[in-house]
Amino acid sequence: MTKLTNGHLVTQDSVGVTRHDYLYRISLKALIYNDAGQILVVKEINRTYWDLPGGGMDYDEDFESSLKRELYEEVGYKGDLRYQLFDASEQMYIERLDANQICFYCRVWSENIDFIPGEEGDEIMFINPEELLLQKSEVDAPARAHAAHMKWQELHSEIVR
């Protein structure tokens, strides 16, 4: 017998041994700066908070195709891009998905910064990184976006030294 419970499969074999296999949703977030050092954020439709553009990988996608799809869906971006994976979140349980999630953060360099709200984006803007901490939110997405910025700055300063 197998059932999905709290983000993992619970399986009981024929002799009564129970096994827990955790399911993970892989999510990608794009850290994109403009020339003024501001960060691109999106407020998705039916959400009340600002976050980095990105989302869950679909089956059979690699990082680049997933990033391109998410950037198109949320901020209307269709061009080429370069990216560097630089951090991963701790595992977190997402109740609405009944799944555990690990989020990978990617620094993205785009061909241009002509962004418009995509089909899943309600509003977009560039924001000073410190202002992310002032955003009122029922979730910690703005704080996680700021933490990603700080991590990138830390890594980038080590590379420059």
Residue ranges: model-predicted function:
Residues M1-K29:
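Acidic, metal-coordinating catalytic segment for phosphate/diphosphate chemistry
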Residues I32-Y33, V41, C106, F126:
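Conserved hydrophobic "DFG−1" position in protein kinase catalytic cores
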Residues N34-E74:
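Conserved Nudix-box catalytic region and its N-terminal flanking loop in Nudix hydrolases
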Residues Q38-I39, E111-F115:
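Short helix-loop capping/hinge motifs at secondary-structure junctions, enriched
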Residues T48-Y49, E119-R161:
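Nudix hydrolase/Nudix homology domain
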Residues K78-D87:
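A short coil-to-beta-strand element that immediately follows conserved catalytic motifs
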Residues E90-I113, M125:
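Active-site-adjacent beta-strand/loop module that shapes the phosphate/pyrophosphate-binding cleft
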